Every structure is written in C-alpha cells, then in structure tokens.
Amino acid sequence: MKKNEPISKVMSTSPISVHEGDPVSKVKQLIEDKGIHHVPVVNGEKLIGIISWSDLLRVSFGEFGNQDGRQLDALLDHTYTVTRLMSANPISVSVHGTVRDAARILGEGHFHALPVVDGENLVGIVTSTDLIRFLADL
C-alpha cells in the first residue's frame, strides 16, 4: 500500500534552505521567486528551524504595513534575524520514515511542511500537497 512507501518517494530532495546568518530579505526573496511557502534553516547541513510564508506575512504587514520592496527588505533585515523569525527545532521526519509517518504528523494540522532529515541533517522536505498528490496518483 502507498502509505507504507518510503518518504523518499514523496519528498522534494535538495530543498531550498537558508543559513542562520542569512538576511531575512533572502528568505522573502526565495519565497517570492521560487513559489514556496516554507524555508528550512540550517547550520551547515543541520536543520535548526523553519520559516513559513505566514511568518513573513505576520511581520511584514503586521509591523511595517505597505512598504515598497526595497524598504521592506531593509526594515526586515534591520529588525529581524533568521534565527529570531524561525520556528526553532521543527518537527521533522526521518528519511527512513514512511508516507504514513509524514501523513500522521501533517494530519494534525499544525503546519503544512515537514523537513526530512538523515540524523540531524536536512535532506528533503514534504508538504501536505505532496502527500495528497502522491496518494491520489496526481
């Protein structure tokens, strides 16, 4: 059955990530340019956090209102660091896990992306959309 398939069949490999010292504007640019909603944060290859599109929206519009792109980038970089904005120690799934493992975690509804790790190192990411497409054969 598909739910017992390895998570490696569903996950995106080589996920787009940022390093803890990168500017917040880089996260914003990646989300806008790549059309993604979640950006893992790494120290070397070790997963240490994740930033979501909604995290950025909360601080971008909640605190800074309507700024043009460059002004907003400057304000974000001056006010926030990646480590301050990220959710630290995110829940993840092992690269040796199954589709069922990921579905159980994502099914709780607290978030929509799950970093995939080998030990502590980021090796992929799986989203609720990835799981739905896989299970529906889309």
Q: What does each of the following model-derived ranges do?
A:
Residues 18-35, 41-43, 83-86, 92-110, ...:
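The conserved cystathionine-beta-synthase
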Residues 31, 39-55, 106, 114-129:
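A glycine-centered beta-loop-beta connector
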Residues 1-14, 53-91, 103-107, 127-138:
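Tandem CBS (Bateman) regulatory domains
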Residues 12, 38-39, 45-46, 67-70, ...:
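Short, surface-exposed, polar/charged, turn-prone segments marking secondary-structure boundaries
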